[in-house]
Amino acid sequence: MQPEQLNQEEESKCPVPPEVRDAWLKSHGGKKPSEVHDTPHPTMLPTEREISTIPKVVTESDSGKEEKWIYPSQQMFFDAMKRKNWNPHPEDMKTIVPIHNAVNERAWQDILQWEQGWGSEKCGGPKLERFDGNVKKLTPKARILNLLGYNKPFDRHDWLVNRCGRKVAYVIDFYNGPTVNGTPSIYLDVRPKLSVHGAWMRVYRWTNEHFSQNSK
């Protein structure tokens, strides 16, 4: 999800596990990958891209460009998955891409809640500077929860947010949520990355929520 041509790594960050994708497709009348024959290249899919609500840090080289992150098109998503040898199918893209976009929008809304009260309104609000996928690297919290018997997240992202010039790191764990009426869901655990400032943000939020509940 970038305002210019996506590189291969950034194109392929889709926080949707195969089992969630398959169940979602089934609930929406789609076919499982095993039921669809391989489609030879080239595959023509929609190239339209959706503009996100996520503000982008604008640099001098970006002057005049869109100041919001832009999601990949169905064609870009398919090509990226093909390069990763994930055996994608064109029919899946119309479902996978909206899920990908919706999950990222939800993650940003959660970050905005964390950012409340930290002064970013004086410069127009926080902006997303960059993001990275770390699917193979468990966060300390996810590791502890797994030791206690909980499932591991199926993906992890690290987002770097610019708050009026201050870099604030966030971590996002993606979990399979419960299936409701045959439709699977995804649970996001969004929080500041563990650091001195991140720990202070967590304490600040917990304190506010605690006293807010007690005052009711």
Swiss-Prot record:
Pfam families tied to this protein: Cyto_heme_lyase (PF01265)
Gene Ontology annotations for the cellular component aspect, listed alphabetically: mitochondrial inner membrane; mitochondrial intermembrane space; mitochondrion
Subcellular localization, as worded in the UniProt entry: Mitochondrion inner membrane
Catalytic activity: holo-[cytochrome c] = apo-[cytochrome c] + heme b
Enzyme Commission identifier(s): 4.4.1.17
Record bears the keyword DNA damage: no
MF GO annotations: holocytochrome-c synthase activity; metal ion binding
Annotated keywords: Heme, Iron, Lyase, Membrane, Metal-binding, Mitochondrion, Mitochondrion inner membrane
Domain of life: Eukaryota
InterPro entries linked to this entry: Holocyt_c/c1_synthase (IPR000511)
Gene Ontology BP annotations: cytochrome c biosynthetic process
Annotated region described as Disordered, given as residue ranges: 1-46
Functional note: Lyase that catalyzes the covalent linking of the heme group to the cytochrome C1 apoprotein to produce the mature functional cytochrome.
PANTHER family listed in its UniProt record: CYTOCHROME C1 HEME LYASE, HOLOCYTOCHROME C-TYPE SYNTHASE
Similarity remark: Belongs to the cytochrome c-type heme lyase family.
Name of protein: Putative holocytochrome-c1 synthase
Organism (species): Schizosaccharomyces pombe (strain 972 / ATCC 24843) (Fission yeast)
